[in-house]
């Protein structure tokens, strides 16, 4: 079953409901852009259609979209790099493209340091139409606000929401009661996206069920019910239904599951779960690259159904999940690790994050393979926070602190002894260690120092049919180091 919020996302501005005045002002801004060349801020509550309107406008105008969203690091350097890419694309294509900067009011986090000033420069210097999207207009800097026009999207009235829900029911061929649609519209208080999610959550056996029936969306506890459903209780199909009932986007669901799965899964379950999360991340990357939001459904399939399907047994009891994932520190930590892996393996940062990091997490889970964890820490120059992120162990624990100290000693020794380099001693040790272990352990240890390629890697390159396969970034580069 597809996500109705994506299946029925407006494709033209004429389909944007409940904000006719804002829609018309936005369209007027676009058509007159050659004359004024100013950026515009679309602001208003979540779920009122700001992002949908931006993409619908791009379709109407025939403009390709280049988007920077909240999941991207938005430091000064990243925004300047993004601006350079936008300018480059415009030069190559020769036409207009729409630049979308999502959550422009959320640049106060540590990882976005310098981002507000860089974004202000971007909108002032842009040679392409720029749309900034914000929930809270006054959370943005005064300099950024003064550099842009603004269009306010107001909360969508229940009177405007009901026809949307009715149209979806007819398209999906499900029975409905007008009173139930009115109830859903009023309960969501201007949030059209939330109303559509509620509608889908209440659909059972070709009928929209009334409040209190099975499937009604709980807006206060739904994220933790979702975690329990995926990680502990429900089948793959049931977990997917729960995912559709949660008022969160697939990228946010991915962050929640990725952050909490080590609290419940372990061993093969955890490794298999990371496989599905990596696949979900690939689909989300395609959404960012193509702006085709129909791919969201495949990301959700992996995050919910995929992770639930690899669970070997149901679990009861209460789990201390903790609060929401801390995006600023968590993402900056992951970005650093992915960058170090990418530099070492000769792959892109995206490939390192999607394809390699999940394997590292599985192989070094809770530092069970201490030698491998030390070797990894030394190779990628990681500190306690990075080791804790990868292994799931606390950064202040004795084992993590000991691993970091041993890795530092290994780096210092290698700096003095230039004969074999930093990893040669580790490989020599590994050869003696693996005499009594199976071949898989030998291959795993080789990831952190072997100079001679494994037979698997050679065979993989031959099967690819290209001599420079390892230099290409096809989404699989670097995996042979860990197989």
UniProtKB/Swiss-Prot annotation:
What is the name of this protein? Replication factor C large subunit
**Where are stretches of biased composition, namely Acidic residues?**
430-443
Bias-annotated ranges (Basic and acidic residues) = 451-463
- Listed CDD domains: AAA (cd00009), HLD_clamp_RFC (cd18140)
Keyword entries, A-Z: ATP-binding, DNA replication, Nucleotide-binding
Which positions does UniProt annotate for ATP binding? 44-51
Describe its partners and assembly state: Heteromultimer composed of small subunits (RfcS) and large subunits (RfcL).
């Amino acid at each position: 079953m597809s996500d109705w919020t994506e299946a029925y996302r407006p494709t033209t501005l004429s389909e944007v409901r409940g904000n006719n005045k804002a829609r018309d002002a936005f369209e007027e801004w676009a058509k007159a852009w050659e004359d004024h060349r100013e950026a515009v801020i679309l602001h208003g509550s979540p779920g009122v259609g700001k992002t949908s309107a931006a993409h619908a406008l791009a379709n109407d105008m025939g403009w390709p979209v280049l988007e920077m969203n909240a999941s991207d690091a938005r430091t000064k350097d990243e925004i300047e790099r993004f601006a350079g890419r936008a300018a480059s694309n415009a030069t190559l294509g020769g036409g207009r493209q729409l630049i979308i900067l999502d959550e422009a009011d959320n640049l106060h986090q540590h990882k976005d340091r310098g981002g507000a000033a860089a974004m202000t420069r971007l909108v002032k210097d842009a040679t392409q139409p720029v749309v900034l999207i914000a929930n809270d207009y006054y959370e943005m800097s005064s300099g950024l606000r003064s550099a842009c026009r603004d269009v306010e999207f107001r909360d969508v009235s229940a009177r405007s929401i009901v026809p949307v829900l009715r149209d979806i029911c007819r398209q999906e061929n499900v029975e409905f009661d007008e009173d139930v649609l009115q109830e859903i519209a009023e309960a969501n208080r201007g949030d059209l996206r939330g109303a559509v999610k509620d509608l889908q959550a209440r659909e059972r056996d070709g009928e929209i069920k009334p409040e209190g029936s099975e499937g009604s969306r709980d807006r206060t506890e739904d994220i933790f019910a979702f975690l329990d459903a995926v990680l502990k209780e429900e089948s793959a199909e049931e977990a997917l239904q729960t995912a559709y009932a949660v008022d969160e986007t697939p990228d946010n669901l991915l962050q929640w599951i990725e952050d909490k799965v080590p609290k419940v899964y372990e061993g093969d379950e955890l490794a298999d779960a990371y496989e599905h999360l990596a696949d979900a991340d690939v689909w989300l990357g395609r959404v960012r690259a193509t702006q085709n939001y129909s791919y969201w459904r495949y990301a959700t399939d992996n995050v919910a159904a995929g992770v639930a399907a690899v669970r070997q047994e149901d679990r009861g009891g209460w789990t201390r999940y903790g609060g929401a994932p801390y995006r600023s520190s968590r993402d900056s930590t992951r970005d650093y690790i992915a960058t170090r892996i990418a530099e070492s393996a000769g792959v892109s940062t995206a490939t390192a994050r999607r394809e390699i990091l999940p394997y590292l997490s599985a192989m070094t889970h809770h530092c069970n393979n201490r030698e491998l964890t030390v070797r990894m820490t030394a190779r990628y120059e990681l500190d306690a926070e990075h080791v804790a992120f990868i292994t799931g162990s606390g950064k202040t624990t004795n084992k993590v602190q000991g691993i970091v100290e041993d890795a530092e000693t290994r780096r210092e020794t290698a700096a003095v002894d230039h004969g074999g380099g930093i990893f040669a001693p580790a490989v020599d040790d590994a050869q003696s260690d693996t005499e009594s272990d199976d071949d898989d352990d030998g291959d795993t240890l080789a990831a952190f120092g072997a100079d001679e390629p494994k037979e698997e890697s050679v065979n993989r390159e031959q099967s690819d049919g290209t001599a420079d396969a390892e230099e290409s970034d096809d989404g699989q580069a670097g995996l042979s180091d860990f197989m």
